[in-house]
């Protein structure tokens, strides 16, 4: 899932969610698509085109399209950045549940999101990759988990102290 939603303006929500299958010549399972659209909270928008959706709704359509795919490795680039706090938490929970048996590479600029969702955290900086945290289950961590706040603080300290921390 790219940071930009990459929705097709001429296609409605259901057609956009089925895009991967259509590109593979499989047509797409519209029943499954409608179930996934319901899971992301957009049932009432399923026949709308992207230009009539908000940025957060568009991002949820892109997430629904990703949820439709049964791949062993999932790449998510800032998948929750356009969402309000409540919807972000709900979509993080949904993604964590749906992708629990898959390898997920999550790109985020949000240390709280990384601590809540990730088993391993790596910092990409100055063309290098550094492992900075290995976390234990459960995932996703509860948003009121006090240990999560301590881990987030520790992560921010490590980010600030890392080489090249100057902007």
Question: Can you annotate each of these PLM segments?
Answer:
Residues 28-45:
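Conserved ABC ATPase "signature" region
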Residues 49-53, 57:
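Conserved ABC ATPase signature
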Residues 126-156:
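Conserved beta-strand-loop-alpha-helix hinge in the C-terminal portion
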Residues 63:
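Hydrophobic anchor residue at the start of the ABC signature
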Residues 68-72:
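A short, proline-enriched helix->beta-strand linker immediately N-terminal to the Walker B motif
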Residues 14-22, 30:
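Short helical segment in ABC ATPase nucleotide-binding domains corresponding to the A-loop/adjacent helical element
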């Amino acid at each position: 899932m790219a940071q930009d939603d990459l929705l097709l303006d001429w296609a409605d929500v259901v057609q956009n969610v089925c895009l991967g299958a259509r590109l593979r010549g499989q047509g797409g399972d519209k029943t499954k698509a409608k179930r996934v659209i319901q899971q992301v909270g957009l049932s009432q928008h399923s026949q709308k085109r992207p230009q009539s959706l908000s940025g957060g709704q568009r991002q949820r359509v892109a997430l629904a399209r990703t949820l439709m795919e049964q791949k062993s490795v999932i790449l998510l680039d800032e998948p929750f950045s356009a969402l309000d706090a409540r919807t972000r938490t709900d979509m993080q929970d949904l993604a964590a549940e749906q992708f629990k048996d898959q390898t997920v590479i999550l790109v985020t600029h949000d240390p709280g999101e990384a601590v809540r969702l990730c088993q391993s955290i790596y910092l990409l900086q100055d063309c290098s990759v550094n492992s900075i945290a290995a976390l234990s289950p459960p995932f996703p961590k509860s948003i009121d988990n006090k240990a999560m706040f301590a881990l987030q603080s520790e992560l921010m300290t490590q980010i600030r102290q890392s080489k090249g921390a100057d902007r």
